[in-house]
């Protein structure tokens, strides 16, 4: 279950420096709701200008405005506002190997990865997901390759005090999980349930009302800061700078 917290932003910027610009609006979610009901190319083509003005362009501005806030959390992560090849995920689905041939995603999202692994979709990073009824911030690694997963598990075993500190940060670490202990690890280990994880992710939920507030960018930054214990541990596990 994702955390729902009252976030403070005072540690990030003085009040006079807090961005006041509203990035997202009810029109953002209205478009996504309508897209879910009309997920076909003809409808999207007819409404592409709405997508750009209510969804894509506000998100690109958000990414650009978030960059200095992200740098204040860690200079090792990047916010890239380019419309193609940057932080923003494409709205188009890859349907080549999917039974669901719906051409478009019904959510919009961006990733803020570690600069030394920005081309790796499973690299440690922050993430923002906007979807009607399911909006959240997240941090961690999602579906890492076998080598990365082994390095993270080894770090949990070799640095148990640091991992215990992550567990005490009040942010629940979640992900898909093996049904049995991973090969090569003690099935009686204190953190065996964590070692079974195939993803290492923590998250904070937001309502549509929160996302549409002018101060949402600060709330998102504060949620990222709250999730740093896990991300710092993962970066160290993979010998990435913080």
PLM features per residue range, with description:
Residues 3-4, 10:
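Intrinsically disordered, low-complexity segments enriched in serine/proline and basic residues
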Residues 130-186:
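Compact, glycine/acidic-enriched structural inserts
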Residues 33-91, 225:
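Active-site acidic/histidine clusters and adjacent loop/turn architecture
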Residues 23-26, 61, 231-234:
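Polybasic/polar functional segments that serve as interface/processing modules
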Residues 92-155:
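Aromatic- and glycine-enriched beta-alpha-beta binding-site module
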Residues 164-228, 234, 238-241:
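Terminal interaction module
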Residues 12-45, 237-241:
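Short, charged, low-complexity amphipathic alpha-helix
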Residues 74-104, 108, 174-183:
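A short, surface-exposed loop/turn module that caps and links secondary-structure elements
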